[in-house]
């Protein structure tokens, strides 16, 4: 008797969709898709195509919130305009990176956000999918974060810049990125052959930096770096 051999699919792209194809053969994967579309078949599994990344989850997970977009999607709401791709996955034009925390919240009821993701981004997705409990949870998390940052000590960074009189106006007028003028000290004049004496000044500037669990709230911009470099030439 001839043996049947499965041709394994390559692993799916990275993200929460990983594992969707890897480990399944082409024939078995196609069979699962066909069964999911048959009446009385394996209909508890739902495939989503979010911004080009595939997610596989259960209908029960997506139906956690009866008022959500995903619940209506599973109920085949006629008022909901939804398309499917060639694999039968529901097409959702959203950021797949931020869909991960939303889907995991529906799975186990806990909000887990990687440190490289912004709470505001998760909130935007929660509002799009209309998941009421998640919206409240993320808003509370944002308020706690802002309150924690406001209570952290503020560091003042000072820089001393040396410049001539003709450079002073331009330097002060172009200062930005949080740098503030503090003090101007005259240090006399320098003599240039063939030119008149040039008055020289020390310009003291400062900037506030708020500490956060992941460092300061902002990295120095190009203009701030220029100020630092000029100050270091003294």
UniProtKB/Swiss-Prot annotation:
The gene is Kctd5. The lineage of its organism: Eukaryota, Metazoa, Chordata, Craniata, Vertebrata. The BTB (POZ) domain is atypical and mediates the formation of a homopentamer instead of a homotetramer. Homopentamerization is due to the presence of 4 residues in the BTB (POZ) domain: Leu-56, Gly-100, Val-112 and Ala-118. It comes from Mus musculus (Mouse). It holds the Pfam family BTB_2. Keywords: Acetylation, Cytoplasm, Nucleus. The keyword Oxidoreductase does not apply. GO terms for molecular function: protein-containing complex binding. This is BTB/POZ domain-containing protein KCTD5. Transmembrane segments: none annotated.
């Amino acid at each position: 008797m001839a043996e049947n051999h499965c041709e394994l699919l390559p692993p799916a792209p990275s993200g929460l969709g990983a594992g969707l194809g890897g480990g399944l053969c082409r024939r078995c994967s196609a069979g699962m898709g066909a069964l999911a579309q048959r009446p009385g078949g394996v209909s508890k599994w739902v495939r989503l195509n979010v911004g080009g990344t595939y997610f596989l989850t259960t209908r029960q997970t997506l139906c956690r919130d009866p008022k959500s977009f995903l619940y209506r999607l599973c109920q085949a709401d006629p008022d909901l305009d939804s398309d499917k791709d060639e694999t039968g996955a529901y097409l959702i034009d959203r950021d797949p990176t931020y869909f991960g925390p939303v889907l995991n919240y529906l799975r186990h009821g806990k909000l887990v956000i990687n440190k490289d993701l912004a709470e505001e981004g998760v909130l935007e997705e929660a509002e799009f999918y209309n998941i009421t409990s998640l919206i409240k949870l993320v808003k509370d998390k944002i308020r706690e974060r802002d309150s924690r940052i406001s209570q952290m000590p503020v560091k003042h960074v000072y820089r001393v810049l040396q410049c001539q009189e003709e450079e002073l106006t331009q330097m002060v007028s172009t200062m930005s990125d949080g740098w503030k003028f503090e003090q101007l000290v005259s240090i006399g004049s320098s003599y240039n052959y063939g030119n008149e004496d040039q008055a020289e000044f020390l310009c003291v500037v400062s900037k506030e930096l708020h500490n956060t669990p992941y460092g300061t709230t902002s990295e120095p911009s190009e203009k701030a770096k220029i100020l630092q470099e000029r100050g270091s030439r003294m």
